[in-house]
Amino acid sequence: MQYSIQKFLNEGAYKLQHIGINNPKLEARILLQHAINKPYEYLLANPEKQLNQLEIEAVEKVLERRLKHEPIAYILGTKEFYSREFIVNKHVLIPRNDTEILIDVVLQYHSQHSLCHSSNGGNPDKKQLDSVVKPRNNIKSSNILELGTGSGCISISLLLELPNSQITATDISIDAIEVAKSNAIKHDVTDRLQIIHSNWFENIGKQKFDLIVSNPPYISINEKPEMAIETINYEPSIALFAEEDGLLSYKIIAENAKKFLKQNGKIILEIGYKQADQVSQIFLDHGYVIDNIHQDLQSHNRVIEISLIQLNRSYARRIGKSLSGIQQNLLDNELPKYLFSKEKLIGKNYNSCKIKSNYTKFNLEKSKESVSRGAERIKIREHLRTYKEDVANFSSSTSIFLEIGFGMGEHFINQAKMNPDKLFIGVEVYLNGVANVLKLAEEQNITNFLLFPNNLDFILHDLPNNSLDRIYILFPDPWIKNRQKKKRILNKERLTILQTKLKNKGSLIFTSDIENYFEEVVELIKQNGNFQITNEDNYSKPHDNYIITKIPPKSY
Protein backbone atom coordinates (compact mmCIF):
# COMPACT_ATOMS: atom_id res chain seq x y z
CA MET A 1 0.00 0.00 0.00
CA GLN A 2 1.28 3.44 -0.96
CA TYR A 3 0.77 6.36 1.38
CA SER A 4 1.84 9.92 0.81
CA ILE A 5 1.88 12.45 3.61
CA GLN A 6 -1.12 14.25 2.14
CA LYS A 7 -3.07 11.03 1.60
CA PHE A 8 -2.69 10.04 5.24
CA LEU A 9 -3.65 13.52 6.41
CA ASN A 10 -6.83 13.38 4.33
CA GLU A 11 -7.83 9.80 5.16
CA GLY A 12 -6.81 10.06 8.81
CA ALA A 13 -8.82 13.25 9.27
CA TYR A 14 -11.85 11.63 7.60
CA LYS A 15 -11.73 8.59 9.91
CA LEU A 16 -11.28 10.74 13.01
CA GLN A 17 -14.16 12.99 12.02
CA HIS A 18 -16.36 9.94 11.48
CA ILE A 19 -16.01 8.90 15.15
CA GLY A 20 -16.68 12.41 16.43
CA ILE A 21 -13.19 13.83 17.08
CA ASN A 22 -13.50 17.62 17.36
CA ASN A 23 -10.32 18.64 15.50
CA PRO A 24 -9.73 15.77 13.07
CA LYS A 25 -7.30 17.58 10.73
CA LEU A 26 -5.17 18.84 13.59
CA GLU A 27 -5.07 15.44 15.30
CA ALA A 28 -4.25 13.63 12.06
CA ARG A 29 -1.31 15.97 11.56
CA ILE A 30 -0.10 15.57 15.18
CA LEU A 31 -0.33 11.77 14.96
CA LEU A 32 1.63 11.74 11.71
CA GLN A 33 4.33 14.02 13.11
CA HIS A 34 4.66 11.74 16.13
CA ALA A 35 4.72 8.51 14.10
CA ILE A 36 7.40 9.59 11.61
CA ASN A 37 9.21 11.96 13.99
CA LYS A 38 9.10 14.95 11.64
CA PRO A 39 8.22 18.61 12.35
CA TYR A 40 5.16 20.35 10.94
CA GLU A 41 7.35 22.29 8.49
CA TYR A 42 8.48 19.00 6.94
CA LEU A 43 4.88 17.94 6.30
CA LEU A 44 4.09 21.29 4.68
CA ALA A 45 7.13 21.14 2.43
CA ASN A 46 6.68 17.49 1.36
CA PRO A 47 2.95 16.73 0.94
CA GLU A 48 3.58 14.16 -1.84
CA LYS A 49 6.41 12.41 -0.01
CA GLN A 50 5.77 8.65 0.10
CA LEU A 51 5.94 6.98 3.50
CA ASN A 52 8.11 3.88 3.80
CA GLN A 53 6.77 0.62 5.23
CA LEU A 54 8.02 1.23 8.76
CA GLU A 55 6.48 4.71 8.74
CA ILE A 56 3.17 3.35 7.43
CA GLU A 57 3.06 0.74 10.21
CA ALA A 58 3.83 3.37 12.84
CA VAL A 59 1.19 5.73 11.45
CA GLU A 60 -1.49 3.01 11.30
CA LYS A 61 -0.69 1.95 14.87
CA VAL A 62 -1.17 5.41 16.39
CA LEU A 63 -4.25 6.06 14.25
CA GLU A 64 -5.81 2.79 15.40
CA ARG A 65 -5.25 3.76 19.03
CA ARG A 66 -6.91 7.13 18.50
CA LEU A 67 -9.84 5.55 16.66
CA LYS A 68 -10.46 3.57 19.86
CA HIS A 69 -10.76 6.94 21.63
CA GLU A 70 -7.49 6.65 23.49
CA PRO A 71 -6.53 10.21 24.49
CA ILE A 72 -3.96 11.72 22.17
CA ALA A 73 -1.84 12.75 25.18
CA TYR A 74 -1.38 9.08 26.12
CA ILE A 75 -0.46 8.22 22.53
CA LEU A 76 2.13 10.98 22.40
CA GLY A 77 3.26 10.30 25.97
CA THR A 78 3.36 14.01 26.79
CA LYS A 79 1.03 16.93 27.53
CA GLU A 80 1.75 20.64 27.72
CA PHE A 81 0.86 22.39 30.97
CA TYR A 82 1.69 25.97 31.89
CA SER A 83 3.87 26.24 28.75
CA ARG A 84 5.95 23.20 29.69
CA GLU A 85 5.91 19.59 28.51
CA PHE A 86 5.11 16.82 31.00
CA ILE A 87 5.33 13.05 30.68
CA VAL A 88 1.93 11.35 31.00
CA ASN A 89 0.59 7.81 30.73
CA LYS A 90 -2.51 5.84 31.68
CA HIS A 91 -1.58 6.00 35.39
CA VAL A 92 -2.05 9.77 35.70
CA LEU A 93 -4.76 12.29 34.93
CA ILE A 94 -4.07 14.31 31.79
CA PRO A 95 -3.37 17.95 32.78
CA ARG A 96 -6.17 20.33 31.78
CA ASN A 97 -5.94 23.97 30.78
CA ASP A 98 -8.45 24.85 33.53
CA THR A 99 -5.99 23.68 36.17
CA GLU A 100 -3.57 26.41 35.09
CA ILE A 101 -5.90 28.81 36.93
CA LEU A 102 -4.79 27.15 40.17
CA ILE A 103 -1.16 27.99 39.34
CA ASP A 104 -2.14 31.60 38.59
CA VAL A 105 -3.95 31.92 41.92
CA VAL A 106 -0.98 30.56 43.89
CA LEU A 107 1.46 32.87 42.10
CA GLN A 108 -0.80 35.86 42.63
CA TYR A 109 -1.09 35.00 46.31
CA HIS A 110 2.69 34.82 46.61
CA SER A 111 3.16 38.12 44.79
CA GLN A 112 0.57 39.92 46.90
CA HIS A 113 1.90 38.36 50.09
CA SER A 114 5.37 39.61 49.25
CA LEU A 115 4.15 43.09 48.25
CA CYS A 116 1.89 43.59 51.25
CA HIS A 117 4.90 43.06 53.54
CA SER A 118 7.04 45.55 51.61
CA SER A 119 8.65 48.62 53.06
CA ASN A 120 6.18 51.05 51.51
CA GLY A 121 3.37 50.01 53.81
CA GLY A 122 1.74 47.46 51.54
CA ASN A 123 1.03 49.71 48.55
CA PRO A 124 2.87 48.30 45.50
CA ASP A 125 4.49 50.89 43.26
CA LYS A 126 5.02 50.52 39.52
CA LYS A 127 8.43 48.91 39.95
CA GLN A 128 7.00 46.30 42.28
CA LEU A 129 4.04 45.62 40.00
CA ASP A 130 6.44 44.98 37.13
CA SER A 131 8.22 42.43 39.32
CA VAL A 132 5.03 40.36 39.56
CA VAL A 133 5.45 39.22 35.96
CA LYS A 134 9.22 38.64 36.18
CA PRO A 135 11.09 35.72 37.80
CA ARG A 136 10.09 35.55 41.44
CA ASN A 137 13.52 35.12 43.04
CA ASN A 138 12.76 37.96 45.47
CA ILE A 139 9.70 36.26 46.96
CA LYS A 140 10.28 34.61 50.29
CA SER A 141 10.41 30.84 50.49
CA SER A 142 7.29 28.80 51.10
CA ASN A 143 6.77 25.24 52.18
CA ILE A 144 3.93 23.82 50.09
CA LEU A 145 1.99 20.54 50.24
CA GLU A 146 0.27 19.11 47.18
CA LEU A 147 -2.28 16.36 47.74
CA GLY A 148 -2.72 13.93 44.84
CA THR A 149 0.13 15.05 42.61
CA GLY A 150 -0.45 12.65 39.70
CA SER A 151 1.99 13.65 36.95
CA GLY A 152 3.46 16.30 39.24
CA CYS A 153 2.57 19.10 36.83
CA ILE A 154 1.18 21.39 39.56
CA SER A 155 4.08 21.00 41.99
CA ILE A 156 6.75 21.21 39.31
CA SER A 157 5.17 24.27 37.67
CA LEU A 158 5.06 26.02 41.05
CA LEU A 159 8.68 25.13 41.81
CA LEU A 160 9.80 26.51 38.46
CA GLU A 161 7.85 29.73 39.05
CA LEU A 162 8.83 30.03 42.73
CA PRO A 163 12.52 29.12 42.89
CA ASN A 164 12.74 29.73 46.65
CA SER A 165 10.00 27.25 47.56
CA GLN A 166 10.00 23.62 48.69
CA ILE A 167 7.14 21.21 47.94
CA THR A 168 6.03 17.91 49.41
CA ALA A 169 3.76 16.05 46.98
CA THR A 170 1.69 12.97 47.80
CA ASP A 171 -0.17 10.36 45.81
CA ILE A 172 -1.85 7.07 46.63
CA SER A 173 -0.74 5.52 43.33
CA ILE A 174 2.82 4.15 43.15
CA ASP A 175 2.59 4.18 39.34
CA ALA A 176 1.63 7.87 39.37
CA ILE A 177 4.55 8.62 41.70
CA GLU A 178 6.95 7.11 39.16
CA VAL A 179 5.58 9.46 36.50
CA ALA A 180 5.92 12.45 38.84
CA LYS A 181 9.53 11.49 39.63
CA SER A 182 10.30 11.27 35.90
CA ASN A 183 8.89 14.76 35.40
CA ALA A 184 10.86 16.09 38.38
CA ILE A 185 14.06 14.79 36.77
CA LYS A 186 13.02 16.18 33.38
CA HIS A 187 12.54 19.66 34.84
CA ASP A 188 15.47 19.48 37.30
CA VAL A 189 13.56 20.11 40.53
CA THR A 190 14.38 16.90 42.43
CA ASP A 191 16.32 18.84 45.07
CA ARG A 192 13.21 20.83 46.07
CA LEU A 193 10.46 18.24 45.53
CA GLN A 194 9.76 15.44 47.99
CA ILE A 195 7.30 12.88 46.62
CA ILE A 196 5.60 10.64 49.19
CA HIS A 197 3.40 7.57 48.75
CA SER A 198 0.44 8.55 50.93
CA ASN A 199 -3.33 8.37 51.10
CA TRP A 200 -4.08 12.05 51.68
CA PHE A 201 -2.31 13.12 54.91
CA GLU A 202 -1.41 9.66 56.26
CA ASN A 203 2.38 9.55 55.73
CA ILE A 204 3.29 13.23 55.97
CA GLY A 205 4.38 13.13 59.60
CA LYS A 206 4.30 16.31 61.66
CA GLN A 207 5.31 18.80 58.98
CA LYS A 208 3.46 22.10 58.73
CA PHE A 209 3.00 24.03 55.52
CA ASP A 210 2.40 27.60 54.40
CA LEU A 211 0.12 26.41 51.62
CA ILE A 212 -1.85 23.30 50.68
CA VAL A 213 -2.85 22.87 47.04
CA SER A 214 -4.75 20.12 45.28
CA ASN A 215 -6.74 19.20 42.21
CA PRO A 216 -8.56 16.36 43.98
CA PRO A 217 -11.06 13.88 42.53
CA TYR A 218 -14.35 15.80 42.47
CA ILE A 219 -16.62 14.21 39.86
CA SER A 220 -19.73 12.43 41.09
CA ILE A 221 -20.24 8.86 39.88
CA ASN A 222 -23.69 10.00 38.74
CA GLU A 223 -22.04 12.25 36.14
CA LYS A 224 -20.22 9.36 34.46
CA PRO A 225 -22.78 8.89 31.63
CA GLU A 226 -22.29 12.54 30.61
CA MET A 227 -18.50 12.28 30.30
CA ALA A 228 -16.35 11.76 27.21
CA ILE A 229 -15.63 8.15 26.25
CA GLU A 230 -11.88 8.71 26.23
CA THR A 231 -11.96 10.04 29.78
CA ILE A 232 -14.12 7.23 31.17
CA ASN A 233 -12.31 4.39 29.40
CA TYR A 234 -8.70 5.51 29.76
CA GLU A 235 -8.01 8.00 32.55
CA PRO A 236 -7.61 6.61 36.10
CA SER A 237 -10.94 6.57 37.93
CA ILE A 238 -9.21 7.16 41.27
CA ALA A 239 -8.11 10.58 40.01
CA LEU A 240 -11.54 11.49 38.64
CA PHE A 241 -14.35 10.30 40.89
CA ALA A 242 -15.21 10.92 44.53
CA GLU A 243 -18.05 9.61 46.66
CA GLU A 244 -20.73 11.72 48.32
CA ASP A 245 -21.62 13.55 45.08
CA GLY A 246 -17.97 14.32 44.40
CA LEU A 247 -17.47 16.11 47.72
CA LEU A 248 -15.67 13.47 49.81
CA SER A 249 -12.20 14.77 48.88
CA TYR A 250 -13.04 18.25 50.17
CA LYS A 251 -14.45 16.85 53.41
CA ILE A 252 -11.24 14.90 54.02
CA ILE A 253 -9.11 17.99 53.38
CA ALA A 254 -11.31 20.21 55.56
CA GLU A 255 -11.21 17.73 58.45
CA ASN A 256 -7.44 17.24 58.41
CA ALA A 257 -5.71 20.28 56.93
CA LYS A 258 -5.60 22.34 60.15
CA LYS A 259 -3.05 19.97 61.67
CA PHE A 260 -0.70 20.54 58.74
CA LEU A 261 -1.09 24.27 58.14
CA LYS A 262 1.08 26.92 59.69
CA GLN A 263 -0.56 29.87 61.40
CA ASN A 264 -2.29 31.98 58.73
CA GLY A 265 -1.88 29.12 56.25
CA LYS A 266 -3.77 29.01 52.98
CA ILE A 267 -5.57 26.26 51.03
CA ILE A 268 -6.06 26.60 47.25
CA LEU A 269 -8.11 23.89 45.52
CA GLU A 270 -9.59 23.19 42.13
CA ILE A 271 -13.35 22.56 42.26
CA GLY A 272 -16.08 21.40 39.92
CA TYR A 273 -17.83 24.33 38.26
CA LYS A 274 -21.11 23.58 40.08
CA GLN A 275 -19.54 22.91 43.48
CA ALA A 276 -18.57 26.37 44.78
CA ASP A 277 -21.44 26.71 47.26
CA GLN A 278 -21.16 23.15 48.58
CA VAL A 279 -17.38 23.23 48.96
CA SER A 280 -17.55 26.66 50.62
CA GLN A 281 -20.06 25.33 53.14
CA ILE A 282 -17.87 22.32 53.94
CA PHE A 283 -14.93 24.54 54.84
CA LEU A 284 -17.05 27.12 56.66
CA ASP A 285 -18.48 24.30 58.78
CA HIS A 286 -14.93 23.33 59.75
CA GLY A 287 -13.97 26.84 60.80
CA TYR A 288 -12.20 28.20 57.73
CA VAL A 289 -12.73 31.48 55.89
CA ILE A 290 -13.50 31.57 52.16
CA ASP A 291 -11.27 34.26 50.66
CA ASN A 292 -12.14 33.98 47.00
CA ILE A 293 -13.59 31.83 44.26
CA HIS A 294 -11.77 32.21 40.95
CA GLN A 295 -13.24 31.55 37.52
CA ASP A 296 -11.67 29.85 34.52
CA LEU A 297 -11.57 31.27 31.00
CA GLN A 298 -15.13 30.03 30.41
CA SER A 299 -16.30 32.03 33.45
CA HIS A 300 -16.94 28.83 35.43
CA ASN A 301 -16.07 28.68 39.13
CA ARG A 302 -12.85 26.69 39.15
CA VAL A 303 -10.53 27.47 42.10
CA ILE A 304 -11.41 28.18 45.72
CA GLU A 305 -9.07 30.09 48.04
CA ILE A 306 -9.42 29.31 51.74
CA SER A 307 -7.70 30.78 54.80
CA LEU A 308 -6.97 29.46 58.23
CA ILE A 309 -6.84 32.75 60.13
CA GLN A 310 -6.23 32.77 63.84
CA LEU A 311 -5.16 35.31 66.42
CA ASN A 312 -1.49 36.09 65.97
CA ARG A 313 1.19 38.40 67.24
CA SER A 314 1.48 40.24 63.93
CA TYR A 315 -2.10 41.44 64.34
CA ALA A 316 -1.43 42.23 67.98
CA ARG A 317 1.45 44.49 67.02
CA ARG A 318 -0.71 46.20 64.42
CA ILE A 319 -3.24 47.45 66.93
CA GLY A 320 -0.69 47.91 69.67
CA LYS A 321 -1.96 45.40 72.21
CA SER A 322 -0.76 42.10 73.56
CA LEU A 323 -2.18 38.87 72.21
CA SER A 324 -3.88 38.13 75.50
CA GLY A 325 -5.36 41.63 75.45
CA ILE A 326 -6.99 41.01 72.09
CA GLN A 327 -8.41 37.73 73.36
CA GLN A 328 -9.81 39.50 76.40
CA ASN A 329 -11.40 42.16 74.19
CA LEU A 330 -13.03 39.50 72.06
CA LEU A 331 -14.41 37.80 75.12
CA ASP A 332 -15.70 41.07 76.57
CA ASN A 333 -17.05 42.15 73.18
CA GLU A 334 -14.98 45.33 73.37
CA LEU A 335 -13.55 45.20 69.87
CA PRO A 336 -14.90 48.25 68.00
CA LYS A 337 -18.52 47.82 66.96
CA TYR A 338 -17.76 48.93 63.45
CA LEU A 339 -15.91 45.71 62.66
CA PHE A 340 -18.37 44.00 60.37
CA SER A 341 -17.27 40.37 60.77
CA LYS A 342 -15.30 39.09 63.72
CA GLU A 343 -14.99 35.70 62.11
CA LYS A 344 -11.63 36.47 60.50
CA LEU A 345 -10.12 37.71 63.74
CA ILE A 346 -11.49 35.04 66.04
CA GLY A 347 -9.62 32.28 64.27
CA LYS A 348 -10.06 28.73 63.17
CA ASN A 349 -12.39 27.84 66.02
CA TYR A 350 -13.44 29.15 69.40
CA ASN A 351 -11.01 26.91 71.25
CA SER A 352 -8.10 28.69 69.54
CA CYS A 353 -8.78 31.69 71.79
CA LYS A 354 -7.68 29.62 74.82
CA ILE A 355 -10.66 30.79 76.86
CA LYS A 356 -10.26 30.57 80.60
CA SER A 357 -12.73 28.47 82.55
CA ASN A 358 -14.65 31.48 83.81
CA TYR A 359 -15.34 32.55 80.21
CA THR A 360 -17.42 29.67 78.93
CA LYS A 361 -19.47 31.85 76.59
CA PHE A 362 -19.20 35.14 74.80
CA ASN A 363 -21.39 37.27 72.56
CA LEU A 364 -20.82 38.05 68.91
CA GLU A 365 -21.82 41.56 67.84
CA LYS A 366 -25.46 42.09 66.92
CA SER A 367 -26.24 38.61 68.20
CA LYS A 368 -28.61 38.18 71.14
CA GLU A 369 -27.61 34.55 71.61
CA SER A 370 -24.57 33.49 73.59
CA VAL A 371 -22.36 31.25 71.51
CA SER A 372 -20.63 28.43 73.36
CA ARG A 373 -17.15 27.36 72.35
CA GLY A 374 -18.46 24.15 70.88
CA ALA A 375 -21.27 25.75 68.90
CA GLU A 376 -21.33 25.87 65.12
CA ARG A 377 -19.61 28.92 63.64
CA ILE A 378 -21.71 31.84 62.50
CA LYS A 379 -21.49 31.84 58.71
CA ILE A 380 -20.64 34.71 56.42
CA ARG A 381 -24.20 34.95 55.17
CA GLU A 382 -25.48 35.43 58.72
CA HIS A 383 -23.01 38.26 59.14
CA LEU A 384 -24.35 39.78 55.94
CA ARG A 385 -27.82 39.97 57.43
CA THR A 386 -26.35 41.80 60.41
CA TYR A 387 -24.57 44.12 58.02
CA LYS A 388 -27.80 44.99 56.20
CA GLU A 389 -29.39 45.85 59.55
CA ASP A 390 -26.46 48.16 60.31
CA VAL A 391 -26.90 50.02 57.03
CA ALA A 392 -30.66 50.22 57.54
CA ASN A 393 -30.12 51.85 60.94
CA PHE A 394 -28.58 54.90 59.29
CA SER A 395 -30.87 57.70 58.23
CA SER A 396 -31.98 57.64 54.60
CA SER A 397 -30.39 61.07 54.31
CA THR A 398 -26.99 59.71 55.36
CA SER A 399 -24.48 59.48 52.54
CA ILE A 400 -22.88 56.05 52.23
CA PHE A 401 -19.49 55.62 50.54
CA LEU A 402 -18.00 52.22 49.59
CA GLU A 403 -14.27 51.65 49.06
CA ILE A 404 -13.34 48.37 47.39
CA GLY A 405 -9.85 47.14 48.27
CA PHE A 406 -8.73 49.85 50.67
CA GLY A 407 -5.22 48.40 51.14
CA MET A 408 -3.62 49.82 54.28
CA GLY A 409 -6.58 52.16 54.70
CA GLU A 410 -4.94 55.60 54.47
CA HIS A 411 -7.49 56.97 52.02
CA PHE A 412 -10.39 55.17 53.68
CA ILE A 413 -9.75 56.35 57.23
CA ASN A 414 -8.93 59.93 56.18
CA GLN A 415 -12.16 60.20 54.21
CA ALA A 416 -14.09 58.96 57.23
CA LYS A 417 -12.31 61.50 59.42
CA MET A 418 -13.03 64.39 57.02
CA ASN A 419 -16.70 63.41 56.66
CA PRO A 420 -18.01 62.41 60.10
CA ASP A 421 -21.63 62.72 58.95
CA LYS A 422 -21.17 60.01 56.29
CA LEU A 423 -20.96 56.23 56.61
CA PHE A 424 -17.94 54.56 55.00
CA ILE A 425 -17.94 50.87 54.10
CA GLY A 426 -14.60 49.20 53.41
CA VAL A 427 -13.97 45.89 51.66
CA GLU A 428 -10.49 44.36 51.93
CA VAL A 429 -9.27 40.74 51.91
CA TYR A 430 -5.92 41.34 53.65
CA LEU A 431 -5.93 41.43 57.43
CA ASN A 432 -2.89 43.69 57.66
CA GLY A 433 -4.96 46.42 56.05
CA VAL A 434 -7.98 45.71 58.26
CA ALA A 435 -5.80 45.79 61.37
CA ASN A 436 -4.19 49.06 60.30
CA VAL A 437 -7.59 50.71 59.84
CA LEU A 438 -8.62 49.58 63.33
CA LYS A 439 -5.40 51.00 64.74
CA LEU A 440 -5.82 54.37 62.97
CA ALA A 441 -9.49 54.58 63.92
CA GLU A 442 -8.75 53.82 67.54
CA GLU A 443 -6.00 56.45 67.67
CA GLN A 444 -8.18 59.14 66.07
CA ASN A 445 -11.53 58.15 67.60
CA ILE A 446 -13.19 57.53 64.22
CA THR A 447 -16.35 55.41 64.33
CA ASN A 448 -18.39 56.17 61.20
CA PHE A 449 -17.44 53.08 59.22
CA LEU A 450 -18.01 49.37 58.74
CA LEU A 451 -15.42 46.85 57.55
CA PHE A 452 -15.91 43.70 55.55
CA PRO A 453 -12.67 41.65 55.65
CA ASN A 454 -13.41 39.32 52.77
CA ASN A 455 -13.90 39.19 49.01
CA LEU A 456 -16.21 41.71 47.32
CA ASP A 457 -18.45 39.08 45.75
CA PHE A 458 -19.53 37.86 49.20
CA ILE A 459 -21.13 41.23 49.94
CA LEU A 460 -21.97 42.70 46.54
CA HIS A 461 -25.35 41.09 45.98
CA ASP A 462 -26.44 41.85 49.55
CA LEU A 463 -25.90 45.58 49.25
CA PRO A 464 -29.29 47.32 48.90
CA ASN A 465 -29.94 48.80 45.47
CA ASN A 466 -29.76 52.61 45.22
CA SER A 467 -27.97 52.80 48.58
CA LEU A 468 -24.51 54.17 47.76
CA ASP A 469 -23.54 57.76 47.05
CA ARG A 470 -20.01 56.95 45.96
CA ILE A 471 -17.82 53.96 45.16
CA TYR A 472 -14.02 54.18 45.31
CA ILE A 473 -11.82 51.69 43.42
CA LEU A 474 -8.32 53.07 43.89
CA PHE A 475 -5.26 51.43 42.33
CA PRO A 476 -6.72 47.89 42.20
CA ASP A 477 -4.62 44.86 41.31
CA PRO A 478 -3.91 45.25 37.56
CA TRP A 479 -3.55 41.48 36.85
CA ILE A 480 -0.94 42.29 34.22
CA LYS A 481 -0.69 38.98 32.34
CA ASN A 482 -3.11 38.56 29.44
CA ARG A 483 -4.54 35.33 30.80
CA GLN A 484 -5.20 37.01 34.16
CA LYS A 485 -7.20 39.97 32.88
CA LYS A 486 -10.52 38.23 33.54
CA LYS A 487 -9.71 38.53 37.26
CA ARG A 488 -9.66 42.33 37.26
CA ILE A 489 -12.08 43.89 39.73
CA LEU A 490 -14.07 45.71 37.05
CA ASN A 491 -15.72 43.74 34.29
CA LYS A 492 -18.96 44.19 32.39
CA GLU A 493 -21.08 42.16 34.82
CA ARG A 494 -19.65 43.63 38.02
CA LEU A 495 -19.89 47.19 36.69
CA THR A 496 -23.58 46.60 35.94
CA ILE A 497 -24.15 45.39 39.51
CA LEU A 498 -22.25 48.34 41.00
CA GLN A 499 -24.34 50.73 38.92
CA THR A 500 -27.53 49.32 40.47
CA LYS A 501 -26.12 49.90 43.97
CA LEU A 502 -25.45 53.59 43.32
CA LYS A 503 -28.08 56.21 43.98
CA ASN A 504 -29.23 58.43 41.13
CA LYS A 505 -26.34 60.84 40.44
CA GLY A 506 -24.05 58.69 42.58
CA SER A 507 -20.40 58.54 41.54
CA LEU A 508 -17.78 55.90 40.81
CA ILE A 509 -14.15 56.98 41.21
CA PHE A 510 -11.53 54.72 39.63
CA THR A 511 -7.75 55.32 39.65
CA SER A 512 -4.86 53.34 38.23
CA ASP A 513 -1.21 53.92 37.35
CA ILE A 514 -1.34 51.22 34.65
CA GLU A 515 -2.21 53.19 31.52
CA ASN A 516 -3.64 50.41 29.33
CA TYR A 517 -5.71 49.12 32.25
CA PHE A 518 -7.11 52.60 32.83
CA GLU A 519 -7.99 52.93 29.13
CA GLU A 520 -9.80 49.57 29.20
CA VAL A 521 -11.87 50.68 32.20
CA VAL A 522 -12.77 53.97 30.49
CA GLU A 523 -13.98 52.02 27.45
CA LEU A 524 -15.91 49.61 29.69
CA ILE A 525 -17.66 52.53 31.42
CA LYS A 526 -18.55 54.11 28.08
CA GLN A 527 -20.01 50.83 26.84
CA ASN A 528 -22.15 50.56 29.98
CA GLY A 529 -24.02 53.70 28.96
CA ASN A 530 -25.31 54.54 32.44
CA PHE A 531 -22.35 56.67 33.53
CA GLN A 532 -21.23 60.14 32.49
CA ILE A 533 -17.47 60.69 32.70
CA THR A 534 -17.01 64.09 34.33
CA ASN A 535 -13.26 64.58 33.80
CA GLU A 536 -12.84 63.26 30.26
CA ASP A 537 -10.97 66.43 29.30
CA ASN A 538 -8.28 65.78 31.90
CA TYR A 539 -8.00 62.32 33.45
CA SER A 540 -4.94 63.38 35.46
CA LYS A 541 -6.90 65.98 37.42
CA PRO A 542 -7.48 64.67 40.97
CA HIS A 543 -11.07 64.15 42.08
CA ASP A 544 -12.67 66.21 44.85
CA ASN A 545 -11.12 65.70 48.29
CA TYR A 546 -8.35 63.60 46.76
CA ILE A 547 -6.04 62.20 49.43
CA ILE A 548 -2.44 61.43 48.50
CA THR A 549 -1.35 57.98 49.70
CA LYS A 550 1.88 56.09 49.22
CA ILE A 551 1.13 55.17 45.61
CA PRO A 552 2.32 58.09 43.45
CA PRO A 553 -0.63 59.26 41.32
CA LYS A 554 0.06 58.99 37.59
CA SER A 555 -3.45 58.84 36.18
CA TYR A 556 -6.95 59.09 37.62
Curated annotation (Swiss-Prot):
S-adenosyl-L-methionine binds at G148, T149, G150, S151, G152, D171, W200, N215, E403, E428, N455, D477. The active site is at D477. Disulfide bonds: none annotated. It is an enzyme of class 2 (transferase). InterPro entries: DNA_methylase_N6_adenine_CS, HemK-like, N5-glutamine_MTase, PrmC_N, RF_methyltr_PrmC, RPE5, SAM-dependent_MTases_sf, Small_mtfrase_dom. It catalyses: L-glutaminyl-[peptide chain release factor] + S-adenosyl-L-methionine = N(5)-methyl-L-glutaminyl-[peptide chain release factor] + S-adenosyl-L-homocysteine + H(+); guanosine(46) in tRNA + S-adenosyl-L-methionine = N(7)-methylguanosine(46) in tRNA + S-adenosyl-L-homocysteine. Keywords: Methyltransferase, S-adenosyl-L-methionine, Transferase, tRNA processing. Residues 1-310 are annotated as: RF MTase. The keyword Transmembrane does not apply. PANTHER family: HEMK METHYLTRANSFERASE, MTRF1L RELEASE FACTOR GLUTAMINE METHYLTRANSFERASE. This is Bifunctional methyltransferase. The gene is prmC/trmB.
